[in-house]
């Protein structure tokens, strides 16, 4: 991973979360501690998914792009790359 940004998030079911990032989005995995956490190469940034049991409260805020969940994160992609996914 070449960028300096790192984000660690609760993932719930780690296997399902890893499958989403790798099989759907096409991200690669990095370091891991089986059953506890896995690093995802999120377009050059390190995203660490942590196995969790606790549910986070659902909260939404109205912003310029509509009613969005908080917290949230994403990646800005060129349209061509987005369409490939």
Regions found by a protein language model. Give the residues of each.
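Vicinal oxygen chelate
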Residues: 1-4, 28-79, 85
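Conserved active-site tyrosine of GNAT-family acetyltransferases
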Residues: 17-22
